[in-house]
From Swiss-Prot:
Binding site for substrate: 55, 79, 101, 158
Keywords: Amino-acid biosynthesis, Aromatic amino acid biosynthesis, ATP-binding, Cytoplasm, Kinase, Magnesium, Metal-binding, Nucleotide-binding, Transferase
InterPro entries per record: P-loop_NTPase, Shikimate/glucono_kinase, Shikimate_kinase/TSH1
GO CC entries: cytosol
Protein name: Shikimate kinase
EC number: 2.7.1.71
Native organism: Brucella canis (strain ATCC 23365 / NCTC 10854 / RM-666)
Family note: Belongs to the shikimate kinase family.
Positions of ATP binding: 33-38, 139
Annotated function: Catalyzes the specific phosphorylation of the 3-hydroxyl group of shikimic acid using ATP as a cosubstrate.
Amino acid sequence: MSGTNKQTNLHRQTETIRQLLGSKVVVLVGLMGAGKSTIGRKVANMLNLPFKDADTEIETVSRMTVAELFEAYGEVEFRDLERRVILRLLDDGPMVLATGGGAYMNAETRAAIAEAGISIWINADLDVLMERVSRRQNRPLLRNSDPRGVMQRLMDERYPVYALAELHLMTRDEKKEVIAAELIEVLAAHLEKEQAASAG
């Protein structure tokens, strides 16, 4: 497909999403390093929608970093705060929302997302994830002697739950603009299918 045709298609798809999304929140789920925030910002910009990062919102309300919250209160308390913040954000749609890696594991959070949003699993293989997270030091779950082993365990635990998301998108070592355009395409097709089903 030529560049012009791709741009025309992308424009049509963004218009479709804006028309059909209503007040729903586009919720990106997946492991740390999958690119939820990077892709989410790009998609929000393309759709002219607000972008929110759940971890950033948590840090704002708590006045602590995610790493500090983990250390001070433990993962259980952090997940409870995370759930409450996400439930509040789901009331503010339409927007694009990137969630923390563990957020979708909470059944109550998943149910709320299913009701008020469209969940999209941003997937990536282990090598891509490790290459990305190695650039950052603020990953409390990876602060040990075997971060690759921890990441593999997280994949084993979480991927079956992430697979419950309505839509799936595989990322790879590709420009964020390309992945964002693929997400737009998948989301537009999903909304059109939903509209056709409700009309039928």
